[in-house]
Amino acid sequence: MNPNQKIMTIGSVSLIIAAVCFLMQIAILVTTVTLHFKQCECDSPSNNQVKPCEPIIIERNITEIVYLNNTTIEKETCPKLVEYRNWSKPQCKITGFAPFSKDNSIRLSAGGDIWVTREPYVSCDPGKCYQFALGQGTTLDNKHSNDTIHDRIPHRTLLMNELGVPFHLGTRQVCIAWSSSSCHDGKAWLHVCVTGDDKNATASFIYDGRLVDSIGSWSQNILRTQESECVCINGTCTVVMTDGSASGRADTRILFIEEGKIVHISPLSGSAQHVEECSCYPRYPNVRCICRDNWKGSNRPIVDINMKDYSIDSSYVCSGLVGDTPRNDDRSSKSNCRNPNNEKGNHGVKGWAFDNGDDVWMGRTISKDLRSGYETFKVIGGWFTPNSKSQVNRQVIVDSDNRSGYSGIFSVEGKSCINRCFYVELIRGRGQETRVWWTSNSIVVFCGTSGTYGKGSWPDGANINFMPI
């Protein structure tokens, strides 16, 4: 091949290569533009029709990056559809409760800036659990912590952290509140926050970080709510609120809220005589609450809430092993399912229970007179049989030598069933421990298990002599 032919051959090959490269670049450009402007489509599970993603609420915005000849193409995939929770799965079958979380707030307060709190509770969104408490507007190692035994001051705020994270200085203050409830409807958080004068308090309803509605005191006597999670089904949330005497007749109302707006209010009906500090759980399609009778009964009231027609019924837990403190000893205590037992009814403590077929799972202080120790057990026939006392599967959560406090329920949706969990408030400081001037708490959390479990005790554990005064 002579030199001219070589030059022509090389030139031809070069032109072919250049043309191929040019066509590839055009193809890459077309692909990039197409992917950029192509409307993302998602298959609707309800009717198998293709719908655009734009009007759908985005939970996670996932980006896939594809590398093609040094050209980066970002492909935005369709996000998951975020829906209201309906809690339609069955309740998990359990053999007892297993340890889940403990925040050790008081022990950590001996050497760190941790909030002074009380009235803690736990609630979960569809992906994560959070702990809440009512802060006293001060850390423990701070002179403002003196005399924080008082419940209602204007500096109290609702605190919110991931479960297991103590309330440190960076903790979010959700709202102003000395009484509260929170729940997630599947799309956003609802917070019910009560604050103000005892005789004319205000409940603010905060949804998705915005104040949406409010309601004032209707009996001018300490408007108050659950101190544990509310419950939302298909976009409607319900919360139990009481205004009136803590040791006599009070006015309890059940509020129904949609995206922060009050849509209906139902009065309490049924046989319950006094209801406050309810611990509520979803019982699809309705909601059930176990509450505190601070007037006549040491057996706990039940409030059944119909989420469709807003009707209310109430009664009392049938178990003769009653759940409130103070109470009679187990040999003499009783309950007939319909009425308060008139046994040491004046005063009490927030608590919980939940139905399990004919039986009832419940928790209570070990001491019948003081907020000391904590135990759980199942009462056979305790949901339907008056004065039933057959106890099985007893567990000690906090031994009787250590302090406890409020307790409440929260629900967690699993793949196939809804699990019931509970928390126990571990109170320290005044009034029992007078070496210090503050009153605060830590928490311990357990959840239902179908497995086996051992024994133990999970008290607060702080040495009061190590603590700031």
Swiss-Prot record:
Its EC number is 3.2.1.18. It is an enzyme of class 3 (hydrolase). Inhibited by the neuraminidase inhibitors zanamivir (Relenza) and oseltamivir (Tamiflu). These drugs interfere with the release of progeny virus from infected cells and are effective against all influenza strains. Resistance to neuraminidase inhibitors is quite rare. The chain crosses the membrane at residues 10-30. Residues 11-33 are annotated as: Involved in apical transport and lipid raft association. GO terms for molecular function: exo-alpha-sialidase activity; metal ion binding. Belongs to the glycosyl hydrolase 34 family. Catalyzes the removal of terminal sialic acid residues from viral and cellular glycoconjugates. Cleaves off the terminal sialic acids on the glycosylated HA during virus budding to facilitate virus release. Additionally helps virus spread through the circulation by further removing sialic acids from the cell surface. These cleavages prevent self-aggregation and ensure the efficient spread of the progeny virus from cell to cell. Otherwise, infection would be limited to one round of replication. Homotetramer. This is Neuraminidase. It comes from Influenza A virus (strain A/Swine/Hong Kong/3/1976 H3N2). The lineage of its organism: Viruses, Riboviria, Orthornavirae, Negarnaviricota, Polyploviricotina.
